[in-house]
From Swiss-Prot:
Cellular compartment(s): Cell membrane
Name of the molecule in the record: Cell division protein DivIB
Source organism: Bacillus subtilis (strain 168)
Subunit composition and interactions: Interacts with FtsL, DivIC and PBP-2B.
Domain POTRA, chain residue ranges per copy: 54-123
Membrane topology label: Single-pass type II membrane protein
Membrane topology (Extracellular): 54-263
Coiled-coil region: none
Listed result of changing N205A: Does not affect growth
Null allele phenotype: Mutants show a drastic decrease in sporulation efficiency. Polar septation is delayed and less efficient, and the completed septa are thicker than those of the wild type. Mutants are also unable to undergo engulfment.
Intervals, Cytoplasmic compartment: 1-32
UniProt family annotation: Belongs to the FtsQ/DivIB family. DivIB subfamily.
PANTHER family cross-referenced by the UniProt entry: CELL DIVISION PROTEIN DIVIB, CELL DIVISION PROTEIN FTSQ
Length: 263
């Protein structure tokens, strides 16, 4: 090997040693800085968790009308100044609130630094229940609100609906109708017979009477506008929608006695 080449290699290595030392020093410094930053972040987290700012400070409730703010907060188990803000399980808490039969949906959102908002969607009123000449709102899931009300044109009046299960089924069927069709119904009587526990009778605002079954009511009732458009306006009667659809004109005594079998 050429002695001159050996000397060049030795010189090159000696020149690189300071650079290697500097690179190692910089790498060590970066590690130290990263460790210090991580240490301070952990300290800040520990301090944060030990201070009141890590707890829920404010709870707001929106969208509720029939369920009080206090009742919703009680159901949520969220306690201001006690519940951990970051560890709050939103889905679990929403399910707790939705145990209330008037609440259709609950949605929880968080906003910094420690505020909680509970957005409520309640079941809407779709009918009125008549009981001892007093009226109560019926919700789309069949629940009945406790306060007395005066009926308007928002929905039909339900009569003889003491069976809660059947009332709930009827409410779901009504909810499937358009608003205009619901508003065309004056009263709905629950009129079960031995062979058909789902039989109902409707008195329409246009003078017609409809007989139907709870289970098929929504689908069959959607054909009502088409049916009456084919009937003479001066001939009223009963439109049967249980099995086969057909029209039966009132007899002479039907109009006077048409509600006697329900009362």
């Amino acid at each position: 090997m050429n002695p001159g080449q050996d000397r060049e290699k030795i010189v090159n290595i000696e020149e690189r040693i300071p650079k290697i030392k500097e690179q190692r020093k910089q790498k060590a410094n970066r590690r130290l800085i990263s460790f210090i930053m991580l240490f301070f972040i952990m300290v800040l987290i520990i301090v944060y968790l030990q201070t009141p700012i890590s707890k829920v400070s404010t709870i707001s409730v929106t969208g509720n009308e029939n369920v009080s703010k206090k009742e919703i907060i009680d159901l949520s188990d969220i306690n201001s100044g006690d519940t951990e803000f970051w560890s709050l399980d939103k889905q679990k808490t929403e399910k707790k609130i939705q145990q209330n039969k008037l609440v259709k949906k609950a949605e929880i959102s968080k906003s910094l630094p420690n505020k909680i908002n509970i957005a409520i969607e309640e079941y809407k009123a779709i009918a009125y229940l008549e009981k001892d000449d007093v009226y109560y709102e019926v919700l789309e899931n069949g629940s009945v609100l406790p306060n007395e009300v005066t009926p308007d044109d928002a929905g039909p009046i339900l009569v003889n609906w003491t069976n809660a299960k059947k009332r709930s089924q009827m409410a779901k069927q009504l909810d499937a109708l358009s608003n205009s069709l619901k508003q065309s119904i004056s009263e709905i009587y629950y009129t079960p017979v031995k062979m058909d526990e789902n039989r109902i009778k409707l008195y329409m605002n246009d003078g017609y009477v409809v007989t139907a079954s709870i289970k098929t009511f929504a689908d069959r009732m959607k054909t009502y506008p088409s049916i009456i458009s084919q009937l003479s306006s001066n001939k009223k009667g009963i439109i049967h929608l249980e099995v086969a659809t057909y029209f039966e004109e009132f007899g002479k005594n039907d109009k006077a006695a048409k509600k006697e079998d329900e009362n």
